[in-house]
Amino acid sequence: MKMTSRKLADLLKQRLQHENRSFFFDREKDTLRVEDQTTKKGITLELPPIIAKWETKKEEAIDEIVYYVSEAMEAMEGSGQEMSGKEAGIYPVIRSTSFPDQTSDGIPLVYDDHTAETRIYYALDLGKTYRLIDSRMLEKENWTKERIRETASFNLRSLPSVVKQDTVADNYFYFFRANDGYDASRILNDSILHEYKQAAEGELAISVPHQDVLILADIRNESGYDILGQMSMSFFASGTVPITALSFLYNEGRLEPVFIMAKSRPKKD
């Protein structure tokens, strides 16, 4: 069966059906919006990337999206999302610079600039999902942005890491995949980056293709850049929340975006 945007939209409507939800399919933009009828809050899904995943993962791709949307909608529809008393559940999350800087209601989200490709947003963990923190939440509870930043940074450092190592063509790759929703966020943990930089025999390159993986690479020869580029593109295409397919070099505590050119060393952006 060939999957089309219309077929996918109908399938998702069926799987996500709820008495208090509305669905809006935009044929021109190839999107499906799932919206709470009471609050008018919701999620807009871009269908082409989901179709691309369906081509290789079939029902598993649909299951992932249904789970992601269901948890996010329940978080929006629920209550009790105050930050006070839940400080231990505040974490930073990495997003691309093209990610919206405000909610669907037009309320500014709290974020900091990170690199030319990425931003740091802040989230309140709700168990199976999380809510991005916006300016209204800060005002309501009289929190400052600095307090959010410091709290999130402290909590991130307390998270355990799950790392898998792979060696390809004498280059070493380390995959951080704890599947806790904050794997990419570990790029903000300077102690981790410093540790791997000190141990690296070559250049330390870093990739955050989507929110559920951080790749550190000890690049020891020219082919290492090509391999990292291929890995990053593959993860970027398969992630539920893609960030960037570009990589970074880590030098003197700074991240420098680079374009990895085939058969050559990277060129700085």
Curated annotation (Swiss-Prot):
It holds the Pfam family DUF1444. It comes from the Bacteria. InterPro entries: DUF1444. Belongs to the UPF0354 family. HAMAP family: UPF0354. This is UPF0354 protein RBAM_026940. It comes from Bacillus velezensis (strain DSM 23117 / BGSC 10A6 / LMG 26770 / FZB42). The lineage of its organism: Bacteria, Bacillati, Bacillota, Bacilli, Bacillales.
